[in-house]
UniProtKB/Swiss-Prot annotation:
UniProt organism field: Vibrio vulnificus (strain YJ016)
Assigned EC number: 5.2.1.8
Swiss-Prot/TrEMBL domain comment: The PPIase activity resides only in the second parvulin domain. The N-terminal region and the C-terminal tail are necessary and sufficient for the chaperone activity of SurA. The PPIase activity is dispensable for SurA to function as a chaperone. The N-terminal region and the C-terminal tail are also required for porin recognition.
Name of the protein this chain belongs to: Chaperone SurA
SUPFAM superfamilies, sorted: FKBP-like, Triger factor/SurA peptide-binding domain-like
Main location per the UniProt record: periplasm
Highest taxon of the lineage: Bacteria
Length: 428
């Protein structure tokens, strides 16, 4: 499914803020000081059914589907509220860059993307605002979950040592997941029996995606339980511990965690791939907007730096030392040293990945301020000790992040005021 089509399902939360008023619309759910309207739920259902029809995917009964959609809308609303609470704002520059990336990933121009969105009954402005909201929610979630993650140096060293003993090859798995969640007062043995019954049905040929839609309470339930392609090192620990050398089509489980019982299916496996790290040596000049220096002023000043460098009036290093507000690199003529692009924020990463060597970028904005950057060199690096430690840290971070984000969402949901309004209350 195209990226923008997946995002259409997100065009639900507080939909009344960006769409035309709907006659006799009703409040379906109260979430803290916000609401989810019945039209939001109806739009989500319509979109999901349309996408399922196009892909030939079976959906569960209407009641089960409605419950899954309402659960997702509640979580989406809470994340949007968290973004508002901590003051996350996505400006037009970052928004435009994100939409351009969506278009590139779909091999479309912006006009083609806009036309495709319109064919789904969504205006381009509605789409833009939803992407802005999705970005803000994602940024808030990432920031708040990162604070909860602690990685000890010994953990990094131990994992780096293990990785260094492996070959350059790694196997990727496409994983399907069903989670049956414990609830207060529930008989855990009854839940285990249900999980075993589902496993038997799956082994007899039941469709995994349909079973996930119907029964799963996991984070990918509305995607039919599909976690996509992952190496073991990228998976949540509870997944990785269960996967040994099983073949495509294997059903694994049920197995128990602190939140419930889990069932996995290996939808597909693809083989060995060589691990090679591309490192980029770049230098930059950073200007931070202030009350005195506006965004436009920062852009003008950086454009003047570019002119002076090209005219031979000053070198990049001289200007970085004199003007850059990144103290760590300014003293080094703006040079950042060899780094993997993944270590940078998305906008900066895009620049250092795509700029030709020796080319200075146009001014661009990140969360840190306004930059110009020049790529000095690129190199391919094998498994050096430094690369292994960077990789080990990313693996540990991703693993803990995937585990912690679920716990954070549960806590967010548990601490929220949520009231589902039934028809009688609306009619009354």
């Amino acid at each position: 499914m195209n990226i923008w089509k997946t995002l259409l399902l997100g065009m639900l939360v507080t939909g009344s803020a960006v769409s035309a008023p709907v006659e006799l619309d009703k409040v379906a759910v109260i979430v803290n000081d916000g609401v989810i309207l019945q039209s939001d739920i109806d739009t989500a259902t319509k979109t999901l059914r349309a996408n399922a029809k196009k892909s030939g995917q079976a959906l569960p009964d209407a009641d089960v589907l409605n419950e899954q959609i309402v659960d997702k809308l509640i979580i989406d609303t809470l994340q949007t509220q968290e973004a508002d609470r901590i003051g996350v704002r996505i400006d037009d520059t970052r928004l435009n860059q994100a939409i351009e990336e969506i278009a590139r990933n779909n091999n479309q121009t912006i006009d083609e993307l806009s036309a495709a969105i319109a064919s789904e009954g969504v205006s381009y402005e509605e789409f833009r605002e939803q992407i802005r909201k999705e970005m803000a929610a994602s940024e808030a979630r990432n920031a708040l979950v990162r604070r909860r993650i602690n990685i000890l140096p010994a953990e990094v060293d131990n994992l780096a040592e293990l990785l260094s003993k492996e070959t350059n090859a790694s196997v990727e798995y496409r994983i399907g997941h069903i989670q049956l969640r414990f609830t207060d007062g529930q008989d855990k043995s009854a839940l285990e029996a249900q999980a075993k019954e589902l496993v038997e049905k799956l082994k007899q040929g039941a469709d995994f995606s349909t079973m996930a839609y119907t029964y799963s309470k996991g984070p990918k339930a509305l995607q039919g339980g599909d976690w996509g392609w992952m190496r073991k090192e990228e998976m949540p620990t509870i997944f990785a511990d269960q996967i040994k050398m099983q073949n495509k089509g294997s059903i694994i489980g049920p197995f128990r965690s602190g939140v419930g019982f889990h069932i996995l299916k290996i939808e597909d496996v693809k083989g060995l791939e060589t691990v090679a790290v591309t490192e980029v040596n770049a230098r930059h000049i950073l200007l931070k907007p202030t009350v005195i220096l506006s965004d436009e002023g920062a852009q003008r000043e950086l454009n003047e730096f570019i002119r002076r460098i090209r005219a031979g009036e000053a070198t990049f290093g001289e200007l970085a030392q004199q003007y850059s507000q990144d103290p760590g690199s300014a003293a080094q003529d703006g040079e950042l040293g060899y780094q993997t692009p993944d270590l940078y924020v998305p906008e900066f990463k895009h620049q250092v990945e795509t700029l030709p060597v020796g080319t200075i970028s146009e001014p661009f904005k990140t969360v840190h301020g306004w930059h110009i950057v020049e790529v000095l060199d690129r190199r391919e690096v094998d498994r050096t000790d430094s690369a292994m430690k960077n990789k080990a840290y990313r693996i540990l971070f991703n693993r803990k992040f995937n585990e912690e984000v679920g716990a954070w969402m549960q806590e967010l949901r548990a601490g929220a005021f949520v009231e589902i309004i039934n028809e009688e209350e609306n009619d009354g």
